[in-house]
Amino acid sequence: MKVCSFLPAATNMIYEMGLERYLNGVTFECPSDKPKVVRTRLEGRNLSSAEIETFVTESSNMGKSLYYVDMELLSEIAPDLVFTQDVCDVCQISTSVVQRAIGSLEKQPKMVPLIPRRLRDVYQNALTIAKELGEEKIGLDYLASLHKRVRAITDKLREHQAEPKRVMVMEWLDPIYNCGHWIPDQISLAGGVDMLSNPAGYSVVTPWEKVQQYDPEVLVIAPCGFQVERSIKEIDQLTSKPGWSELTAVKNKAVYLADADYFTTPSTTLVDGIELLAALFHPQLFEIPETCMKKVVPISDTELSWV
């Protein structure tokens, strides 16, 4: 069976389950040496957060997709199965674009759209992938290992009767976006509550005044698609805002930059994200996982690096 994964989350889970032998094509974002079938019009553009927001908005208004398929490569692969998504046309290539692309192929592959809204949907997607590849047992074992890691966190929070922290996870810097979809589930399991979030829904522009009024105890900044190194370059867009130093999170030195993959890629990295958040929300109970050490930075550390 020849498989193409048109979203990094599916690619990640396929690799995590040890099923990469089925993969024949992936996206430009996938950490894989497989042929890159899906590309984006943003490749090679060194744009700021505000410029990306403008580009995305203008493309949407003109009915243009941010992504396209390398049809020559896809025809050469002639996949039997294609995993795609139907959650966010900004984050990944949409099902409608994929449908048009595969419609011109001589051999029509089976298309399996993955539609995660909450964390439980992400788990179900892993099982769907395993079943489609004829490897259900591997999928079940994989899920059991993820659930075990999450239970270790929730059990410890319950044991110590830890009070939920008032937090905010920010998905974009300019303009500021709150978090949505499965991220509020991650926050809850890690011992926090984000009253600015939009569970199971899209993240939306959130006025700075609203953030000030909410006054989070812990602030985690993880712009979609950005790694810490990229976010550091634009963090002054927040730190220069009026009233920044008055936020409780700032006073408590509880503001962090983190890689977006821990929150915006609906795969096993979400469990890594839960473990990371638990350590940021309740440092007296949890330590930052060793695998996350280089992918999360306290704002105070970034400020020192500018001196």
What are these regions (language model features)?
Residues 1-307:
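N-terminal ligand-binding lobe of clamshell/alpha-beta domains
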